[in-house]
């Protein structure tokens, strides 16, 4: 009987901790994809002194964004928001 009480208390603790974790995760925006910066063609000739104005996007650029490099890759593109 004592083992049953211990198991039930342990299960309640696990459920309580998992319920607290779910509420913490709701506050985080998981729909935002983490992206890396990249160098557009007009950022300058040297990668060390260039301001990286582009953003790496998988496959093609999203709507409202344009490809800013002349280099073609099958997996990712360097994109930035359209001007104007």
UniProtKB/Swiss-Prot annotation:
One of its GO terms (cellular component) is extracellular region. The modification Lysine amide is found at residue 83. Residues 20-33 form a propeptide. The keyword Disulfide bond applies. One of its GO terms (molecular function) is toxin activity. Keywords: Amidation, Cleavage on pair of basic residues, Disulfide bond, Ion channel impairing toxin, Nematocyst, Neurotoxin, Secreted, Signal, Toxin, Voltage-gated sodium channel impairing toxin. InterPro entries: Myo_ane_neurotoxin_sf (IPR023355). Residues 1-19 form the signal peptide. It is found in: Secreted; Nematocyst. Disulfide bonds join 38-78, 40-68, 61-79. It comes from the Eukaryota. Binds specifically to voltage-gated sodium channels (Nav), thereby delaying their inactivation during signal transduction. Belongs to the sea anemone sodium channel inhibitory toxin family. Type II subfamily. This is Delta-stichotoxin-Shd3a.
């Amino acid at each position: 009987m004592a083992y049953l009480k211990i198991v039930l208390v342990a299960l309640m603790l696990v459920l309580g901790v998992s319920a607290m974790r779910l509420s913490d995760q709701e506050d985080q925006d998981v729909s935002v994809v983490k992206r890396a910066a990249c160098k557009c063609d007009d950022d300058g000739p040297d990668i060390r002194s260039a301001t990286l104005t582009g953003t790496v996007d998988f496959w093609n650029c999203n709507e409202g964004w344009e490809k800013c490099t002349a280099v073609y890759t099958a997996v990712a593109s360097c994109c930035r928001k359209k001007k104007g």
